[in-house]
Amino acid sequence: MQMRPPHFFHNIVNMKHYLLIIVSLFTFSASYAQFSSVSTNIVGWAAGNINAAIDVNVNLHNTLNIPVSVNPLKFGDTQWSHVVLQPGWQHWFVERYIGHFIAPSLVYANYTIGYDKRTFKGNAYGIGCSWGYSKLLSTRWNFIVEIGIGIVYTPYTEKLRTKYIGEFDDEYTYYHRRFLLLPLKCNLAFSYLF
């Protein structure tokens, strides 16, 4: 009598074959892609944000864009700190990194805004769309202009700053939830293609 492996073992072997095929397809498509890019936003730097974005090629007319922005700084009595992640999909009408594109994107932000006597802390979750244009400066450098708008849901807390709480004042915390229509992207960016 011949011993057969259990049925679940056969499924694992098939899953390994499928996984190998999927990895091979991604490897082939990645080697087919001529270049990706790294960029930084000048408007973000002017606002005091440390920022960078990575673009990964998907095909001839599409790229995956992953920008990250961080601002951990305080200026005297004012605080405007945040971490923002905005993954998006860019569809290029001519070819990657050339000409006009549209870009739907998601947004996640964790922020603290403190000024005057109040501090606001919260998260923001949103979705938006932007339009942009990329101009080739040289073989490896591009200049990108992008502007976008979106809807953001933000649950946050509002507190009176502790140094402003007097002897007879009560410390309070308000909890808010809001939907906001906001400009989500305002980019003047230099992009390096590799």
List each language-model region with its residue ranges.
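Positively charged n-region of N-terminal signal peptides that target proteins for export
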Residues: 4, 10-18, 34
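Bacterial N-terminal signal peptides
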Residues: 20-27
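Sec/Tat signal peptide C-region and signal peptidase I cleavage site
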Residues: 29-33
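Extracytoplasmic loops and strand-loop junctions of Gram-negative outer membrane beta-barrel proteins
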Residues: 35-37, 113-116, 168-174
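Solvent-exposed loop/turn segments connecting transmembrane beta-strands
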Residues: 37-53, 74-81
